[in-house]
Amino acid sequence: MALPAGPADAICALCQRAPREPVRADCGHRFCRACVVRFWAEEDGPFPCPECADDCWQRAVEPSRPPLSRRLLALEEAAAAPARDGPASEAALQLLCRADGDPLCSACRMAAGPEPPEWEPRWRKALRGKENKGSVEIMRKDLNDARDLHGQAESAAAVWKGHVMDRRKKALTDYKKLRAFFVEEEEHFLQEAEKDEGASEDDELADPADRFRSLLQAVSELEKKHRNLGLSMLLQ
């Protein structure tokens, strides 16, 4: 049942904070109503106290269920029974072996020798299972985020690959144009040289120094023209 806010030192045994809409089990432990509902949200029963595993709340939904004291007495009687492998009642199987996870009755635990197997209450294992489930959900979310980032990286790589291919095609086209221009200018230069050579044969009295200076000037103008054209094409 719901209780008013208790003293300052009364905290919820699950969230370790002051209880909100506090409820109290008959064993004395206090909890937030939301914490208890969330703790047993996926369980059909039994409903022991989340802190001490007392079955006071289970008796509220099962009035015919024997109290914890009588169940402990049944465990003691089972422990004193001589037959270890005999059929055990459901009330006696309240422990789980840490080694293999099978139910462990008190008779088996007492007959295990000087070093009995480690055991834990079932409700502790249920709580650990809920914690593991939360960890799995976090790992699944991180995995989905990593997949999204991987997809974004692949998309960006595809875009940059397209840009690189476009620049490569443009550079190849400019190179072909420049090469064709050089071939054309080379043919034009050879034709001019042949004309100058024919003119020099007709004019044997011309000064060789003048003809050399004229040829050198033509070569300089051609080199300057080629250089300017190459720079203009590279800067496009």
From Swiss-Prot:
User: What's an example Gene Ontology biological process for this entry?
Assistant: protein K48-linked ubiquitination
Q: Does the keyword Nucleus apply?
A: yes
Q: Which InterPro entries match?
A: TRIM/RBCC, Znf_RING, Znf_RING/FYVE/PHD, Znf_RING_CS
Task: List locations, semicolon-separated.
Answer: Cytoplasm; Nucleus
One GO CC annotation: cytoplasm
Residues with PTM Asymmetric dimethylarginine: R98, R109
Which molecular-function annotation in GO is an example for this chain?
ubiquitin-protein transferase activity
Does the keyword field hold Ubl conjugation?
A: yes
User: What is the superkingdom listed in this entry's lineage?
Assistant: Eukaryota
Q: Copy the pathway line from the protein's UniProt record.
A: Protein modification; protein ubiquitination
Q: Which reaction does it catalyse?
A: S-ubiquitinyl-[E2 ubiquitin-conjugating enzyme]-L-cysteine + [acceptor protein]-L-lysine = [E2 ubiquitin-conjugating enzyme]-L-cysteine + N(6)-ubiquitinyl-[acceptor protein]-L-lysine
As stated in the Swiss-Prot or TrEMBL entry, residues carrying the post-translational modification Phosphoserine are: S200
Q: What is its EC number?
A: 2.3.2.27
Family annotation (Pfam families): zf-C3HC4_4
RING-type zinc finger positions in the chain? 12-53
- PTM comment text: Ubiquitinated; undergoes 'Lys-48'-linked autoubiquitination in the absence of growth factors and MAP3K1-induced 'Lys-63'-linked polyubiquitination. 'Lys-48'-autoubiquitination leads to degradation by the proteasome, while MAP3K1-induced 'Lys-63'-linked polyubiquitination results in the stabilization of the protein. 'Lys-48'- and 'Lys-63'-linked polyubiquitinations occur most probably on the same 3 C-terminal lysine residues (Lys-195, Lys-224 and Lys-225) and are thus mutually exclusive. Other sites of ubiquitination are not excluded. Arginine methylation by PRMT1 stabilizes RNF187 by facilitating K63-linked ubiquitin chain formation, and enables dimerization, c-Jun interaction and subsequent AP1 target gene expression.
Q: Which UniProt keywords apply?
A: Cytoplasm, Isopeptide bond, Metal-binding, Methylation, Nucleus, Phosphoprotein, Transferase, Ubl conjugation, Ubl conjugation pathway, Zinc, Zinc-finger
Cross-link Glycyl lysine isopeptide (Lys-Gly) (interchain with G-Cter in ubiquitin): located at?
A: K195, K224, K225
Q: What is the annotated role of this protein in its UniProt record?
A: E3 ubiquitin-protein ligase that acts as a coactivator of JUN-mediated gene activation in response to growth factor signaling via the MAP3K1 pathway, independently from MAPK8.
Summarize subunit and interaction data from the UniProt record for this chain: Homodimer. Interacts with JUN, independently of JUN phosphorylation. Interacts (via C-terminus) with TRIM7.
- Domain topic, free-text comment: The RING-type zinc finger domain is required for E3 ligase activity.
What PANTHER family is this protein classified in? E3 UBIQUITIN-PROTEIN LIGASE TRIM
Official protein name in the record: E3 ubiquitin-protein ligase RNF187
UniProt lineage: Eukaryota, Metazoa, Chordata, Craniata, Vertebrata
Gene that this polypeptide is encoded by: Rnf187
